[in-house]
C-alpha cells in the first residue's frame, strides 16, 4: 500500500509549526495506541503516526521531505519503518526511562514561532520590527493555580497525585497491566473543585503583547532570531519558553544573494563592450563606477570587493559579482546598418544573440 503524505497522516498542512506537529502526534498516538485502542488496524496506524512524527519533528528531515518527498527523508534515516515501541507515547507524557515524571514538577513553557517578511534591502540594512503576539500568560486572579481565589487545587483522589492510573486488559497474550494518563485529572495529579472565574481552571489567560525584535543587517532568508523567555509560560513555576522569529526575505528584481555575496547581470551596449567604457553599477550600498575593458564579452564577470551583504556577526562584507550582458542593437537606422555591414566585412564578425530587456530593469532601478 502506498504511503500517505506525512502531513495528511497527522491532519496538518505544510505550514504547521513544531508545536502543532507535537500536539497532533500526542493526540493521535494516544488515540491509536494498541494498548488502548483494540481496533484491528490500530497498531498499523500507530506505526504510521510515529513514522510521520519522526520525520516532521526533525527540522533537517522535514526540510528534505518537503523538498524531495519520501526519498529526501530517507537520506537522514527517516521515512522508513517507525522504530518506536508501544511504550514510547507514555515515555513522551511521563518522562521515559522507566520513571514517571512528577506532574507537579516545574516544567518549561512552550516555544513560540513568528514569521517576519522583509524586503531585500531591509535584510541588507537590518531593522527593528515591532510584532504583536497573543500569548498565554499566568492568570493574575488565581496566580496560575486555576482555582478560585481563597481555594486551592486538591490532590486527585483517583491517582493519588501521580497523574497516571493503572488499567488491566485481557489480551490474547493474557492479562496485561498498563498505565495511562489519569482520566480524572488528565495527568496533572490535581483536581479543582471551584475553578477560577477568569481562566476557568487553566491557570493561564491569553494576552496581547508587543515585542520589539532587532533584526541584524545581513540576515538571510530562513534564519531565525531567538528571544529567550518570550514564549509560553512555564508550568508549576518552571521557566518560560522562547520566541523564535523566522525571517523571510523577498526576492529582489536585480540582486541575487549567494551566501554573503551578491550576484547581478549588467547590460552594456555593443559599443561599450567593443571599445571599453566606464559604467555606473548599482550595489546595495549605492552606485559605483566600473571600468569595462575593450573587447568585453557576454558572461564576463567583475568583482566589487566589499559591496556584498554585511555579516550578521560583524565581520567584513561579502563581495558583489557583476556578469556583463552585451546587448544586441535593434531598430537601427540605415546608416547604422551600413556601418555595421562595413565593420563585418572588415573584421568578419558575425552577429550575437539578442538578450532580454535588462535595460528596462536597470532603468527602473536607477529611477528610484
From Swiss-Prot:
Mapped CXXCXGXG motif repeat ranges: 139-146, 156-163, 182-189, 196-203
Subunit structure, as described in the record: Homodimer.
Main location class: cytoplasm
Any one GO molecular-function label of the UniProt entry: zinc ion binding
Pfam families documented for this protein: DnaJ (PF00226), DnaJ_C (PF01556), DnaJ_CXXCXGXG (PF00684)
Family: Belongs to the DnaJ family.
Keyword Zinc-finger found: yes
Function: Participates actively in the response to hyperosmotic and heat shock by preventing the aggregation of stress-denatured proteins and by disaggregating proteins, also in an autonomous, DnaK-independent fashion. Unfolded proteins bind initially to DnaJ; upon interaction with the DnaJ-bound protein, DnaK hydrolyzes its bound ATP, resulting in the formation of a stable complex. GrpE releases ADP from DnaK; ATP binding to DnaK triggers the release of the substrate protein, thus completing the reaction cycle.
Sequence positions that bind Zn(2+) 2: 156, 159, 182, 185
Subcellular location as annotated: Cytoplasm
Gene3D superfamilies for the chain: 6.20.20.10, DnaJ domain, Urease metallochaperone UreE, N-terminal domain
Originating gene: dnaJ
Necessary cofactors: Zn(2+)
Gene Ontology biological process terms, A to Z: chaperone cofactor-dependent protein refolding; DNA replication; protein refolding; response to heat
Alphabetically ordered keywords of this record: Chaperone, Cytoplasm, DNA replication, Metal-binding, Repeat, Stress response, Zinc, Zinc-finger
Protein name: Chaperone protein DnaJ
Cofactor note text: Binds 2 Zn(2+) ions per monomer.
HAMAP family (UniProt xref): DnaJ (MF_01152)
Bilayer-crossing regions: none
Residues the entry annotates as binding Zn(2+) 1: 139, 142, 196, 199
